[in-house]
Every structure is written in C-alpha cells, then in structure tokens.
Amino acid sequence: MRFLFLFLFLFFSFQQNSWSENILTEFLVAKPSMPDPRFKETVIVMLYHNQGKGAAGLVINKPIRTMLISEFFKSSNMTPPEKIVDKEITLYWGGPVDAEHVFFIHSSDYKSNDFISSNRDFTITQEPKILFDIVKNKGPQEYIILSGIAAWEPGQLDSEMMRDDWNKKSNNYTSPFDNGKEMWSRLINSRDI
C-alpha cells in the first residue's frame, strides 16, 4: 500500500509539474551512522520536501552499470533512431522506489521542454527526447541517467533528520556530475557538513 501511495503521489506530482516547495538547491548526504543499508554513503539531490506531503529525491552517486546506449534503448523497449552514435553510458541507482522509471539530470546547456525541476546549473526530466538527442550528438554536455527514486511518506524524512541520519548540503559544494563514487567521501569529510 505504501508503494501505491508513493507511486500515485509521484506520478501526479511529475505530471502536473506542481512542486510547490522545490528545493533543488539542496543535497542530502548520508551520515556514516546511516542505519538503512540502501542509503549507506549516498548523496541525494532533493526534488521536494513538505512535512504534510512527504519528500522525494534522486540518489546521484551510485552507478549500477555501464552499457552501450543501444542496449539501454533495447532494455527500455524504445526504438532507437536509425543512425545511432553508440556510446557508453552509465546507469545510476536513483532510489528504491519505482525502479522502472527513468530520470535524467542534465546540464543547463540543454533545454528540456517538459522538466520536473530546474535550477541555474542543472535540470531533472523524464523526457525521453534527451536520449535521441544524445545519440545524435545534440544532447547536453553533461548528464546522468537514473533508475528509480528515493521517496518518503509525510514526516518520515523529518524523523530521519531528527535521528541525525542525514546532513543537508547546498549545491554550491557539489554538482550531480561530480565523480559519483568519490562524491560521498568528499562531502562527508568537508568541514561545513
């Protein structure tokens, strides 16, 4: 039931682009004492946090696997363009909820028409057009592709914050495009966290 609630919440929020409390300028950094093994040493870019509605974000430092973009098209049941520049991409674990949903975080040099959230440095979208532009060498300079999302029910993330599982960090200190594997250790060892 919890996952059905989260799916419906995320589906309608994304469809309506109605993030009333967009906090894309914040990252959550798991503390070394994080009790949930799924979130050990994770860095999450926050999409939304509202005590009454819950929270959502994307884990940005957990690569799952590297593959050719043609493999990604095939595994996503998408028809690739006829002429494809087959380059390697890395798929990241975005979180434990809705693993079949794909998200893209890309640099601001590329414009998405249908985006979930955006700031001056990067944009988050589910628009598949970005893949077609990447294979045509018309995509963003920087991007990451994520499977799944991290989502919390109302009050759940607040409890985890009170329990001291997470630290907040502004995006002045990192970018989603920094080295994923080393991002957590660099952030957790910085003085201001």
Where are these regions (language model features)?
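Short hydrophobic/aromatic segments of transmembrane alpha-helices and their interfaces
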Residues: 1-3, 140
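Sec-dependent N-terminal signal peptides
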Residues: 3-13
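A short aromatic-anchored loop/beta-hairpin motif
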Residues: 19-146, 150-193
